[in-house]
């Protein structure tokens, strides 16, 4: 089965560190910061004094080398500052895709979650949309299995969840294009938006570091 959509080449470092710091708990996002020039970075707090760090590395980064503590720790020190103690808990390097299967049903096989559609992590759409898939599907399966509905009911799963997946893919792709612009024009537009957002409220709504998902409306 083939996927329809885009594969993004940029690599990202993801790291969990344990630290006691006075950073605000809300998510921080940096565009072109001095500690990661021409790239992006993210920091947000999790439970038990664990902080998640996400850094764009670019398409040419060596994933094996970038996972090594000798490479990761200096990057994090440049981000947090030399006087912030931390313990490195976990690291990985990833790429991502924004795509879906042409159909979420193939005979008696039904696809949900990442097996049906894949999106970037910006906007928390991956696991959330998988739960929505299952919520749409399980009651239909139950009715078919006990003979209270025909198998044709399962076709509505595909018809309803594909538009929802397309909406997530569209918004996830837009977030990714804003965070990781691929052309000089896209970068200039992004940077102008960020500059205007400093003083103009209308521009703040245009800053896109990951539009959060919304419930799908079935028509």
What feature does the model see in each segment?
Residues 1-96:
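Conserved FAD-binding catalytic core of PHBH/FMO-like flavoproteins
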Residues 8, 65, 126-127, 182, ...:
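Aromatic-acidic/polar surface patches that form glycan- and anion
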Residues 8, 17, 99-101, 106-109, ...:
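Short capping/connector residues at structural and topological boundaries
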Residues 60, 74, 143-219:
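Helical substrate-recognition/capping region of FAD-dependent monooxygenase/halogenase enzymes
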Residues 88-90, 94-175, 179:
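Conserved mid-domain beta->alpha element of the FAD-binding
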């Amino acid at each position: 089965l083939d996927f329809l959509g885009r594969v993004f080449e940029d690599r990202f470092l993801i790291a969990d560190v344990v630290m006691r710091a006075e950073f605000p708990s809300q998510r921080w996002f940096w565009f072109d910061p001095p500690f990661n020039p021409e790239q992006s970075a993210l920091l947000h707090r999790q439970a038990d004094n664990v902080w998640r760090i996400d850094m764009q590395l670019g398409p040419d980064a060596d994933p094996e080398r970038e996972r090594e503590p000798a490479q990761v720790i200096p990057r994090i020190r440049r981000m947090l500052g030399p006087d912030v103690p931390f313990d490195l808990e976990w690291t990985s390097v990833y790429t991502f895709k924004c795509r879906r299967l042409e159909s979420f049903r193939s005979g008696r096989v039904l696809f949900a979650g990442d097996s049906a559609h894949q999106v970037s992590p910006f906007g928390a759409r991956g696991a959330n949309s998988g739960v929505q898939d299952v919520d749409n599907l399980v009651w239909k399966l139950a009715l078919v299995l006990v003979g209270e509905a025909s198998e044709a009911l399962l076709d509505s799963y595909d018809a309803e969840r594909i538009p929802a997946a397309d909406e997530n893919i569209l918004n996830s792709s837009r977030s990714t294009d804003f965070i990781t612009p691929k052309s000089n024009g896209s970068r200039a537009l992004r940077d102008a938006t960020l500059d205007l957002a400093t003083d103009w409220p209308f521009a703040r709504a245009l800053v896109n570091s990951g539009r959060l998902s919304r419930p799908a409306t079935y028509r």
